[in-house]
Swiss-Prot record:
It is found in: Cytoplasm. It comes from Urochloa panicoides. The keyword Glycoprotein does not apply. The gene is PCK2. Residues 1-23, 64-86 are annotated as: Disordered. This is Phosphoenolpyruvate carboxykinase (ATP) 2.
Amino acid sequence: MASPNGGVTTYDYHDSDSAAPVNAQTIEELHSLQRKAATTTKDGASPLQSISASLASLAREYGPNLVKGDPEATKGAPPVPIKHQQPSAAAATIAASDSSLKFTHVLYNLSPAELYEQAFGQKKSSFITSTGALATLSGAKTGRSPRDKRVVKDETTSQELWWGKGSPNIEMDERQFVINRERALDYLNSLDKVYVNDQFLNWDSENRIKVRIITSRAYHALFMHNMCIRPTEEELESFGTPDFTIYNAGEFPANRYANYMTSSTSINISLARREMVILGTQYAGEMKKGLFGVMHYLMPKRGILSLHSGCNMGKEGDVALFFGLSGTGKTTLSTDHNRLLIGDDEHCWSDNGVSNIEGGCYAKCIDLSQEKEPDIWNAIKFGTVLENVVFNERTREVDYADKSITENTRAAYPIEFIPNAKIPCVGPHPKNVILLACDAYGVLPPVSKLNLAQTMYHFISGYTAIVAGTEDGVKEPTATFSACFGAAFIMYHPTKYAAMLAEKMQKYGATGWLVNTGWSGGRYGVGNRIKLPYTRKIIDAIHSGELLNASYKKTEVFGLEIPTAINGVPSEILGPVNTWTDKAAYKETLLKLAGLFKNNFEVFASYKIGNNNSLTEQILAAAPNF
């Protein structure tokens, strides 16, 4: 191009978007340049040796040949397996399986981004939603299978655990556990790759548990990445042998003709071996709740109380525990933007204070809305697992009202996704222990102060009432009792946990409260639901200490102490009898509920702690009197 003075204009290309050729000879080399190598542990073989031991066949006494990394990523490169232990002379006569001749690739503690990629390549049912969450399916099972859960009954557990009527613990023997374990391992070892997570339970560093999860699905690995406490690189280097291991072979069925099996689904726990085996169900919640059951066994042995509760802390350091079954408002009332969230579901109470067991939240999603649950709504983003939700195939927007797959739709996300989460998830000793009940009979007070015996009684009872439809279309309340507000997960007799709760409350000066979030002025269909703003005022009065200085009067039958006045709450609703126009119907309904409490408690009445029955007698004295 000519310049104004007749010369030639030259161009300076340094400011343009041109560049030197890339330093790669093949497309594979270019791909390798795209991904910067991550830092590795000081001893790269160390976790593989430990994982190989975890995957070892009990019959052959040695683990598979393991290679770290995705088989696709290492294609063309010669595998460098770890050397497994050779079998003993006694095991040498047992024929080696074909799986010992192949390499199993271990994908170890992958990041969420890596697990997304694995999930997309592994299953047609994994998609990214419009907000960045991973939507996936859990297969035929969309909830837990409590009837298929088994616990090994041996000389120790036969004496320690709660067995029989009312207990969630269904027995199996050690031999059948080992058979199921071998079945799960044979399946996992036959795969080209398995996902392994090494993580922690319990934010109290003095009492945390090392857990290893071995699974065939990337979504399960991401789920547990979110739900357990995530180790740092330094902690992984010294992780060593886990305290407990889950073998999740849920894509492979159990043998329904084997002993103790009732279906092709089987969830087995051996407390002696510190292992859990999952067959025939891909529902991720089995892993979370299985570990919770294990914590219910291990922690009380250390003098630590494990609790199925929510927990938050005020600005002054006052901690509150919230217990309640589904529909009582536990999540709503424990989520308070004026207080820090320690956890939403599983906690420990030790001499150090309270601590969250988990590193994440597993929230229900059915009918989720931004207006009602903004924290959960905003937490559903990249890294979150959305289980069994329905979404628009083009926009990928989730329809949280759609129950086509199940009503039990769930979101699993790290607790850090909640803006007011307290990290680390620990706090001082609780000042208040709040037991929530949605009483659809309408006879329990909106709030009652409990003494220690009453706290133990209502904690063991774990009461709420649901509204169930009858054949003629009339809806009647149905009482529901779940010991310790989580009977499905406890290992010991409920009285043991109740005694530990009372001991810690007395030692650290906590007060017990029973809060009814249900009906007033009549049962469901006659009275009205207690307004949420009133319940929030009650909870605020508990947190502030206002109710400690209130005047109280005692109710009949249940013998509950109810305050005569609370700021912001109409005094007439504090006494249930005041709100019923039909006083005879009130008395009849009150006695009916009291009878249901007594009938439910019969299974607990004969349990002894120590050499006498004094504690149980003390608890029974707090029962309804009529």
